[in-house]
């Protein structure tokens, strides 16, 4: 009887853990006609990120965490710093020093020269960190792909390493979505 109760308790704990994991899975949206398989170069745009704790990374460190995470990507990733350099060479405007709204507008106007799509990361930095990764087509500036990645609930997770880990999950998931679309296109072309 004691063994049965222990077994039931373990099963219940496992079910609760599994339910918790399922509820906290990333939410992915691929828009119709996204053409993710055609994205060979993805530029990182300026993120929507604001520190809520003193020990959190600065915006520049957050951008670096995103770019460092891109090493797991199969797609060629263009850093925000490289985009700023290219735009400054082409237009004479340094998007890193002008007001953010102007910088975003100029980025959107110029990004088509260097990339097939661009990524804007938004970090909801409340009691639980949630990273929203939105990919936009350069020709229309319309969102074609979105991924919501929940993080941990503790303030200890608001650091460079945690943000990099969340961004790595984005790049892996984006690559899988692009591969799935490519396979689907190949299958449709065979038929």
Give residue spans per PLM region:
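Bacterial N-terminal signal peptides that target proteins for export
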Residues: 1-11
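Short, flexible beta-strand-to-coil junctions
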Residues: 48-54, 121-128
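C-terminal/domain-edge helix-coil "capping" segments
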Residues: 23-43, 63, 72, 112-113, ...
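N-terminal segment of the mature soluble domain
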Residues: 52-102
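Acidic/histidine-rich, surface-exposed loop or edge segments in extracytoplasmic proteins
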Residues: 38-52, 87-90
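Short, well-structured alpha-helical segments in soluble
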Residues: 104-114
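Well-ordered beta-strand positions
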Residues: 117-119
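Bacterial N-terminal signal peptides
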Residues: 9-19
